[in-house]
Amino acid sequence: MISFVSGRVAAVTPDSVIVEVGGFGVQLLATPATIARARVGERARFATSLVVREDSLTLYGFADDDERTVFELLQTASGVGPRLALAMLGVHSPTALRAAVATEDVKALALVPGIGRKTAQRIILELKDRLGTPSTAAAESTSGWRDAVHAGLLNLGYTARQADEAIAAIAGELDDSAAVDTATALRLALATLKRP
């Protein structure tokens, strides 16, 4: 197993980060929040999980060990593969996922594309005792999301002006909430940029 990858960020795509390691470009599929923190040309370290299939080897990258642990635990639920687990982490932070499972919040889990009511109920049933309880200290700050979203939009090819306008458009909605999930903020910002 490859536990982590450390090196210079060579490129960023909408769904992955490419890290130069020993002359090789290693592609890591990642969540929007993880991608938003990666800056081309700078050194970075990603916790990783290698998923081996009959026809492929896929490396998934995460901001920290906790995110990787939740990713791997999510896959122990029936019907949840690596793509769906990554989508769940793209919509909710590890803390938010733990809270949703602990409080049996079917609606929160059903916000993830590919998860309906029955799948959400099954995930809650199978993971309630294994996923752990949410940590209140791990909630993201309300101001930190702005920098992460700005960096993410710049890495995706948007100008600084476009990034600032998108952040301004969603700021009123997000600053009212106690904890802002970076992935959600980035998704909302991208949605404002795609409007005609």
UniProtKB/Swiss-Prot annotation:
Keyword vocabulary terms for this entry: Cytoplasm, DNA damage, DNA recombination, DNA repair, DNA-binding
GO biological process terms, semicolon-separated: DNA recombination; DNA repair
SUPFAM superfamilies for this protein: DNA helicase RuvA subunit, C-terminal domain, Nucleic acid-binding proteins, RuvA domain 2-like
GO molecular function: ATP binding; four-way junction DNA binding; four-way junction helicase activity
Region: Domain III, residue numbers: 141-196
Record region (Flexible linker): 136-140
SMART domains: HhH1 (SM00278)
Protein location: Cytoplasm
Segments of this protein annotated with the region Domain I: 1-63
Region (Domain II), start-end ranges: 64-136
GO cellular component, one term: cytoplasm
Pfam families per record: HHH_5, RuvA_C, RuvA_N
HAMAP family found in the cross-reference section: DNA_HJ_migration_RuvA (MF_00031)
Function comment: The RuvA-RuvB-RuvC complex processes Holliday junction (HJ) DNA during genetic recombination and DNA repair, while the RuvA-RuvB complex plays an important role in the rescue of blocked DNA replication forks via replication fork reversal (RFR). RuvA specifically binds to HJ cruciform DNA, conferring on it an open structure. The RuvB hexamer acts as an ATP-dependent pump, pulling dsDNA into and through the RuvAB complex. HJ branch migration allows RuvC to scan DNA until it finds its consensus sequence, where it cleaves and resolves the cruciform DNA.
Family label: Belongs to the RuvA family.
Subunit structure: Homotetramer. Forms an RuvA(8)-RuvB(12)-Holliday junction (HJ) complex. HJ DNA is sandwiched between 2 RuvA tetramers; dsDNA enters through RuvA and exits via RuvB. An RuvB hexamer assembles on each DNA strand where it exits the tetramer. Each RuvB hexamer is contacted by two RuvA subunits (via domain III) on 2 adjacent RuvB subunits; this complex drives branch migration. In the full resolvosome a probable DNA-RuvA(4)-RuvB(12)-RuvC(2) complex forms which resolves the HJ.
Entry comment, domain topic: Has three domains with a flexible linker between the domains II and III and assumes an 'L' shape. Domain III is highly mobile and contacts RuvB.
Protein name listed in UniProt: Holliday junction branch migration complex subunit RuvA
Lineage, uppermost ranks: Bacteria, Bacillati, Actinomycetota, Actinomycetes, Acidothermales
